[in-house]
Amino acid sequence: MKGKYLLGILVILGALGYMVFGGLGRNLVYFLTPSEYLQDQARYQNRPVRLGGLVKPGTVQYDKDRLELRFVLTDGVAEVPVLHKGTPPGMFKEGQGVVVEGRFQEGVFQGTNLLVKHSETYQPPKEGWTPEEVRKLIEEAQ
């Protein structure tokens, strides 16, 4: 009788462990940096990958008519030109950390999905701020 209970508990714990750790691995966002890509370009040509880094200041160009966003992604060592079709996320800006999903084609990363990194920490307004300043801060963050 004890053996059946022990076996049942082990099966439940095994299933629970698989759900927790198996699901965790699928939800993590792994990405290449521009330096990693440049070290082995042939391996990643025409294959779906995630590329992560910072949007290089002064390189952002957005064509509203064609819905094309062009920018250079850098890790501080190497740079890769990116073309993303679609509207940029509201928090997208120069110097911002991003992860772009897509493929390398002819030396340009063709992005299909653009994820913007942001801080997970909430910072309350500093003392002495007026409600208008707080409202402006909130609007800029959206």
Curated annotation (Swiss-Prot):
The UniProt keywords, alphabetically, are: Cell inner membrane, Cell membrane, Cytochrome c-type biogenesis, Heme, Iron, Membrane, Metal-binding, Signal-anchor, Transmembrane, Transmembrane helix
Show the Gene3D superfamilies listed in the entry.
Nucleic acid-binding proteins
Q: How does it sit in the membrane?
A: Single-pass type II membrane protein
**Gene Ontology terms, MF aspect:** heme binding; metal ion binding
Compartment(s) of residence: Cell inner membrane
Provide the GO biological process annotations: cytochrome complex assembly
GO CC field: plasma membrane
Which sequence ranges are listed under topological domain Periplasmic?
A: 24-142
> Which residues are involved in binding heme?
H118, Y122
* Membrane topology, Cytoplasmic segments: 1-2
Say yes or no: keyword Zinc present: no
The disulfide bonds in this chain are none
> What does this protein do, in the record's words?
Heme chaperone required for the biogenesis of c-type cytochromes. Transiently binds heme delivered by CcmC and transfers the heme to apo-cytochromes in a process facilitated by CcmF and CcmH.
| Protein name per its UniProtKB record | Cytochrome c-type biogenesis protein CcmE
